Design a protein with these regions (language model features):
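All-alpha helical catalytic cores of prenyl diphosphate-utilizing isoprenoid enzymes
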Residues: 141, 145-148, 173-178, 183-197, ...
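Post-HExxH zinc-binding segment in Zn-dependent metallohydrolases
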Residues: 253-294
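A well-structured
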Residues: 1-130, 433-435
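Active-site recognition of the HExxH zinc-binding catalytic motif
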Residues: 113, 217, 221-244, 261-268, ...
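C-terminal, non-catalytic "cap/extension" segments appended to globular domains
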Residues: 7, 326, 330-444
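Acidic/polar loop patches that form or flank catalytic/metal-binding clefts of enzymes
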Residues: 192-193, 245-249, 273-283, 343-344
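Secondary-structure capping and boundary motifs in well-ordered enzyme cores
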Residues: 7, 67-70, 97-100, 140, ...
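Contiguous, non-catalytic segments that form substrate-binding/exosite surfaces or channel walls
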Residues: 66, 71-222
Length: 445
């Protein structure tokens, strides 16, 4: 397997360097400048498209081919070792490979920051959340970090009056998958243009006509895989809703990870975990999982899926502690990029900070530092977008509830057409034409 990862790394490096060579060629720069000189004659979407082309070119110019090639190979190796380390529940198995990725990412951040006139971490952040910098995030995250503990404690106190009954039993992955597929279809995922598979960590990849959603099933927890699959369905619906007339153009792509995450979190946290959706889902749950008794009633399922609880796993977190999970990762990755934290010490740093942020210490590396693959594949400055995405999701949801009549009734009936149309019109169909701030303001007032 390790040999295959090296081969895959070579292939990815070849593709990355070829794309880089095309973007940084003098011909592309000449064409961009020629188009810029004629900007007065361009339509609005073409001006936005040119802006995105220039942005891609500028980011590419900062990177030498050799660094791109080394990073592609390093992340391919680290990803394979991460999967093995997670299975073995032993961070030491991936630590040296992650250290290589971190070192190369530091070099990349420094070069990118120098070229763009940004702090190294801000330069990485700008890739995932264009226009959003730490100067704006730090006060927001500081406020969240200060207020979250009391909000969590208040919720825990309120829950004590009516704690949810646990779901007991074991549920075959095939039955869980069937439930996921039926729910995804109802929400609008087209299985003639995509599919659902299993993986160590859930993700969504692909293009508009071929979207791949994955999830991970736990036999003792039938809602673990379901919530992950429907979270990823939010990502997929966003990709499907991007403007078809601008397909394959930079302006027709995602506006950034914060907006993408807002769509997955809106679907999972606001729609799927709601009482109306669980009312709609209940017959499917009965059909595929076969549960019976008070624990399987809608009221209990609602309390179960909305309860605030300390979990070491981000993917199992509720809407309050999810933000604490994200802040933990933001703290650690900034230390990694700045050089204040060595990759070799990451596991202990994670466990110690988890006690502060989450009030719980992971029992193993698998439920601690190894639960996400993002850093192994080089995705640094990715997690701040999760926090922003959660906040954007709440803003959009409030606007939707104000504008869509009988939203709860429609969801309970399994009618998601009006909801999906609102999102396509106000979010998905905008593509990268507007920046995130302008898009959210236009959508919410």
């Amino acid at each position: 397997m390790l040999f295959r990862s090296d081969v895959r790394g070579e292939q990815l490096a070849a593709l990355e360097t070829e794309c880089h060579a095309l973007l940084t060629s003098p011909k592309v720069s000449r064409l961009i400048e020629r188009a810029q000189a004629s900007a007065d004659s361009l339509e609005d979407w073409q001006i936005a498209n040119l802006r995105e082309m220039r942005r891609q070119r500028d980011h590419s110019l900062a990177m030498p081919n050799a660094l791109i090639s080394r990073l592609a190979k390093a992340t391919a190796r680290a990803e394979v070792h991460w999967a093995e380390a997670r299975r073995n529940r032993r961070y030491a198995d991936v630590a040296p490979f992650l250290a290589e990725v971190v070192a190369l990412t530091r070099d990349r951040a420094a070069l990118l920051g120098q070229h763009l006139g940004l702090d190294p971490y801000d330069a990485l952040l700008d890739e995932y959340s264009p226009g959003v910098l730490t100067g704006a995030l730090d006060p927001l995250f500081k406020t969240l970090g200060r207020r979250l503990p009391s909000m969590v404690q208040e919720s825990l106190t309120l829950q004590m009056a009516a704690p949810p009954l646990p779901i007991e039993g074991r549920f075959a992955p095939s039955r869980q998958r069937a439930l996921c597929v039926e729910a995804m279809k109802a929400l609008g995922f087209p299985f003639d243009r995509g599919r659902l598979d299993e993986s160590e960590h859930s993700f969504t990849e692909g293009i508009t006509g071929d979207l791949r959603v994955t999830t991970h099933f736990e036999p003792a927890d039938p809602f673990h895989g379901l919530l992950a699959a429907l979270h990823e369905t939010g990502h997929a619906l966003y990709q499907l809703g991007l403007p078809p007339e601008w397909r394959d153009q930079p302006v027709g792509r995602s506006r950034g990870l914060a907006l993408e995450e807002s769509q997955s979190l809106l679907l999972e946290m606001c729609v799927v975990r709601s009482r109306p959706f669980l009312t709609f889902l209940k017959p499917m749950i009965d059909r595929h999982l076969g549960g019976s008794g008070a624990a399987w009633e809608v009221d209990n399922l609602y309390r179960l899926l909305t309860r605030v609880h300390a979990s070491p796993l981000r993917i199992d977190a509720d809407e309050l502690t999810y933000l604490a999970h994200v802040l933990l990762r933001c703290d650690l990755e900034r230390q990694l990029i700045s050089g204040k934290l060595a990759a070799a010490d990451l596991s202990e740093a994670w466990n110690s900070l988890a006690e502060v942020r989450l009030g719980i210490r992971p029992q193993s590396d698998a439920e601690g530092v190894l639960q996400d693959d993002h850093w192994a594949v080089g995705q640094f400055a990715y997690f701040p977008a999760h926090a922003l995405g959660g906040l954007i999701a709440m803003q959009l949801w409030e606007a939707i509830r104000n504008e869509v009549e009988d939203l709860d009734g429609a969801i309970a009936r399994g009618d998601f057409s009006t909801l999906n149309q609102w999102l396509r019109t106000n979010v998905h169909g905008v593509g990268a034409r507007s920046d995130v701030q302008a898009l959210v303001k236009d959508a919410t007032g």
